[in-house]
Amino acid sequence: MKRIAIVGAGMAGLSALSALTKQGHVVTLFDKSRGSGGRMASKKVGDASWDMGAQFIRAHDASFMKTLHEWQHQGWVSEWAVTPHVIDAEGIRLSDDETTRYVGVSRMTALSRQLLAPATEFIPNTRIVSCQRTDSEWLLTDENDQHHGPFDSLIINTPPQQALPLLENSHLAAAINDVEMLPCWTLLLAFPERIDTPVDAAFVHDSAIAWLARNNSKPLRDSGETWVIQASHAWSQEQVDAPREEVLHALEQAFFTALGVQGYAVSEHWLHRWLYAVPAKPLDAGALFDADRAVAVCGDWCQRGTLEGAWLSGQQAASYF
């Protein structure tokens, strides 16, 4: 039995937690946010709520499909029976997409809370800023100069830019130094009435927007009319430091234009910038491991830029211990 620290409670970190606790290890998770889930984030403003990060889960890998079905049996996820539209210069039409999509119920963060349960300890609101390896143990220090540990092994589940300062004396730093992460501006809108459109989700082209979805079309969501609008990564990169009001206005207008509707009053809104949303080019390495220092690094950017990729990456990271 080992004492293992995981920095970052996103999907890959939760995946590693699942595997490690099944092996009997004692696992402590740290996260800079107040909760778990990373990009499985949800947001509530007034009476409105949204999944503001990852919109759904899908599976290509047989082992992950088995895991998804187990979660479904436990009531942690449910199928989102949606066929996305395509919106482009030719108009609005149904896509030929037949992918089965799943969502956490009653929000994406509900799944992360279930996956967090096996942790020996979860320490939120704690940003780890340095990790020191002695002869056989890890000691972690947070931004308030509080020390944590000792631990036998360490798993880092953060974007590569945030992992680098924690890997100063590991050869893994060179392996991830050039990994590029792309941003994504996300606008959340709520309306006092239902928008008259057959679209519940759509891939959008020729626009600042790449994806939009009627959040309340997902199973077991609040009934109020809520929409998630995700900008394209290229547009987000161009506008990465633009004033928030300008970004909000541009995405709101692009939303109405894409759906071909006007005259709907917005009752609530929220704008969020995901600075490290997805990898431009995943490493396709599964996870990275420094055996000499007993540290592994995982995340969707190590495998594939999806929740499935993050889960598989976490499983591989855990296998090293």
Model region roles, listed by residue range:
Residues H249, F256-R293:
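Flavin (FAD/FMN) cofactor-binding core of flavoprotein oxidoreductases
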Residues G37, G46, H147-D200, V261-Y264:
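Central helical "cap/lid" subdomain
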Residues F56-H60, I92-Q114, D241-V247:
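Short beta-strand to alpha-helix junction loop
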Residues K2-F30, A318-F321:
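N-terminal Rossmann-like FAD-binding beta1-loop-alpha1 element of flavoenzymes
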Residues L188-Q239, E246, A250-L259:
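Active-site substrate-recognition segment that forms the wall
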Residues P124-W138:
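A conserved short coil-to-beta-strand element within the FAD-binding core of flavoproteins
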Residues S42-H85:
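N-terminal FAD cofactor-binding segment of flavoenzymes
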Residues T21-V45:
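Glycine-rich FAD pyrophosphate-binding loop
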